[in-house]
């Protein structure tokens, strides 16, 4: 039997100082506590900053490239009381590569991080969210899903596949009151521009708070 879900508990997978931190801050303003999953070196830098802003932050070190270990980490989180009612998958492997030069190993690793990690998160979270009567599963996508960039071959493939995966997940959980969607950022994220992380975070909040009759499987951010 899944443990009870806390609707004011956000799980951010792939925590970083840009969009991820913006989402944590936006949800934090609404009283959410956050659990951040990332590699330890990222958490060591980000978590103290967010706590210094008065946000309630827990951290869990995990490497999505180790899918078995990553799944076990998620199972521990969702097997404890107060499991997250909102999951945001924000992980990606953005290193440049060219499709005709990259290796099979590189393509597989990127696919694990860009796509499979989101699917695993949904697989683990869905039973708890179903038992709770609802929840939210969001994933960060990008304009590369629409317009592949030759110098970012693996990432372009991954973002397109992620959108397809989230659409399938959405179809599988909608009747359970769970909203699954991608948030597609159609531009370069940079503070102080139209693509400021805090502006983008507002769209994540909209996706989470939309009424069921307004649910979309993709929310697009094209600039403030």
What do these predicted ranges mean?
Residues 16-17:
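Conserved glycine-rich cofactor-binding loop
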Residues 31-45:
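Conserved glycine-rich Rossmann-like NAD(P)H-binding loop of the short-chain dehydrogenase/reductase
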Residues 50-68:
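Rossmann-fold cofactor-recognition segment
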Residues 79, 113-131:
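Amphipathic alpha-helical dimer-interface segment in Rossmann-like NAD(P)H-dependent oxidoreductases
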Residues 100-119:
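Catalytic Tyr-X3-Lys loop
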Residues 110, 130, 136-161, 167, ...:
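Catalytic loop of short-chain dehydrogenase/reductase
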